[in-house]
């Protein structure tokens, strides 16, 4: 019996051996081949290798080159290979039932791609434990088949082949999942396998962990519109912001748009994501970020979060960085080659083995330079520039650009009062940076009062349902508004400037922050594009400084916005404490119903976070003690923003204190003395007047708060001027002053505008207070026209001598050629004095010159002088009044005489006559209030031109008072000229002034007719001395300035003493006028000396003997001509008129 089992086994083996020879060779061979094939997959790993070598890829539906597996094994060692060999997706034997999934024809056919409506991926993982059980079962079934064949004498091979059929479903475990699902698979050998379902554009993949994150192992395509289609350049399936119904994602291609204008664009994306009531800066930053992403990555993406979509696609060729990288391939390769060569020479020449650290440093430098300059090729043997891991767009740019907002947001959210504190966790991940700019917009809107309406509604609606403290007037009106309203009503520009100084500074610093951030982002982009040029310089010691400077600038532009934000938070915090004390803010997230009304009832999904002062004084989390409550209630901001609540709380507390107290046996006066309120309601000395003590305390608190705020404003204003340099010094970078708006730019512009408005208002008030231009009369009647005889009207120095243009003729000795000139609207009194010519004596019957010789100064022969010397002072004072009127709004004349300026007016008739033209170019004054004055001056100049024309015609026709005395025959031309002149005299446009006593002048006139040429100079000098004595006996006004050389010649000098203009901008003009007058005096003195000595161009033509005095005078005059103070005009063609 003991030998029975052994005997049975021997019999079975012998029977199997005998029957084996009866089977056909072909049948046995096929069966054995099947068994060998199956036994080659004794484990899941060996089976995976076999499938990889003999069949198509079973682990994925998307074929990839073998080199990809090698790279992925480096990124995810062990894990990737283990998952790769066990994963099954493309296997029709598995996925043909309800358990694994029924996919006729296999999972990878186009018809069986993943439905985007239900993006579920089915896959299976091989399990070694179940595989061992399956193989043991096959061995047992084979043994039974052999025993059966021995006993029955049949063929066992069919049963054996059936026993060894590859029953994959027995040792594969089915899985399914959607993007984001993950799990673990437990097995023998390598016990745990981690898997996760991820979506990569139009593919859903099974991934495992690696050094760089989730590494895809096997993938399957989704249905249309995927894969690559006409919409792929602007589609992003992962973006659900613009999809109303996520279940209907693939049905409408335009619903997938996230970067195009069809989705609202960058502005709409930022606006919808913002949570502040007044959106100002976040759309600007979002549009800048999208522009940078398109510039650096591809035009098909609008965020660095989508960089993986185009890493291996040809759409990257539109990137500026990519194009520069392609151009730098050979140069970077040359740098790396030189580095390898130098390192090899170093090893050969060192004579000893270098430490291992140098080898490690060598390898790390090579990897670093390649990764950040041109990218590492992830497909060995593939020369495509698209299959590269680029460190700049995958790591550097996202870190730097997100870091700018990240660092600044840390500081911005550190507000002690809780005002405008936005948590970036409440935003979508792609727009979390908007929390920083929402905080900035919120603060600017709060300090400028732009959120008054929204805060009013929300605060009253959510006031802890305490309607006893309901205050309809409670809103966040900034304190400056309470100064601005009375300032505008009163018209006090100083008060307006004080009220607007803080909001202007807030706007200016906020604008600088936005501008500085954008400039830092642009600078980082520029430096990043140049990375292929600067990063290879890291290899060599000689060029290392260039790389260090490049990195230092990158870090500086990263940190500078944080410094600016720190300054802003400090400024805002001090301001909050100065105006609001220890008040704390609460926030409420509401739906923007106001926005819906503005959009005509449209729906809006944007929620707004509103901040208002917490008036729940029992909230110990924000008001831990009574001092904090009193600090808030007594603050200026709270009292101004909550006037009714403040009064109500004050009255309630006072009355409650009295009611709750029991007098007992205390006398009434002592009982009432216990209450501070009652003891304070007595009149007491205030700061400026008698007032109740309680009211005085409130006024004192308000004034102290204002002083604190002004002092804070002063400190912040001065510090802000150096903010850009301070930020640059802290970060050792470049200051942004030259490329960004300065922190005080808007503040100074606003203050300048207020100053200009104040000056304009002041100028209008002055004109109105004078009663208009018509009131500026000399007291003789006739309005403005009465003043023409006394003053010019074209500018501060457009004063015409009595002998010229609009005044009566003057008398000099008989001359051969009388110099009569027309007046220019832009000439001055010194011109009249300088144009005096004393020609040699001539017969009394000399005729008057032709009209071509007319100039401002009139020199005509006359036996009598028609100037009334007693009225000189009155004439000068009248002209002073008119000149002051014109000076207010007229710019200073140019110092250069007779230059070639376009406005210069040159009288060609004066050439060759020895008359010097001193016409100065006057420009329009910048004060707009002078427009009316300038228009009236133009009317005066028109009247003057009319007077000059009439007088010139009168003189040219042989008329005038001098000719009347000579008894000449009156021609028709002379008659008409006299008629026209008399009409002007009768209408009051011009006034003739005559001198009473002419005996001295007549005496010298007769002597001058009898003297010869050699004695005339001496006689003229004596005549001037006599006239000096006569003029000294006449009382003149303090402003009168008389030229001694012109006395007796009929020329009156109208020089005026200019007073300080009320407009401070006119001080410079007055100073320049004074310098011009000094130059004129110098010119007049030299010219008068030249004429008195017998010199001048007219005398030179006579060939007289040159005296020492004349030589000195000529020398002085020539020096003035050479220095450009005066320009002498000559015309040789008119010498015959001299």
Swiss-Prot record:
Q: Which GO terms describe its cellular component?
A: plasma membrane
This chain belongs to the protein called Uncharacterized protein RF_0089
Concerning InterPro entries, the annotation shows: Conjugal_tfr_TrbL/VirB6
Signal sequence residues: 1-28
Per the record, the similarity remark reads: Belongs to the TrbL/VirB6 family.
Q: Does the keyword Transmembrane apply?
A: yes
- Keywords linked to the UniProt accession: Cell membrane, Membrane, Signal, Transmembrane, Transmembrane helix
Biased composition, class Polar residues, residue ranges:
854-869
The superkingdom of the source organism is Bacteria
User: Where in this protein does the record put region Disordered?
Assistant: 775-914, 958-977, 995-1071
What residues form the membrane-spanning segments? Answer: 331-351, 359-379, 392-412, 494-514, 520-540, 554-574, 699-719
Ranges of biased composition (kind: Basic and acidic residues): 875-888, 961-977, 995-1032, 1058-1071
Q: Where is the composition biased (Pro residues)?
A: 838-852
What segments bear the compositional bias annotation Gly residues?
775-784
Query: GO:BP terms for this protein?
Result: protein secretion by the type IV secretion system
Task: List the subcellular locations.
Answer: Cell membrane
User: Would the keyword Signal be found if you checked this record's keyword annotation?
Assistant: yes
Q: Note the topology in the membrane.
A: Multi-pass membrane protein
Q: Name one Pfam family in it.
A: TrbL
- Spell out the Low complexity composition-biased ranges: 801-830
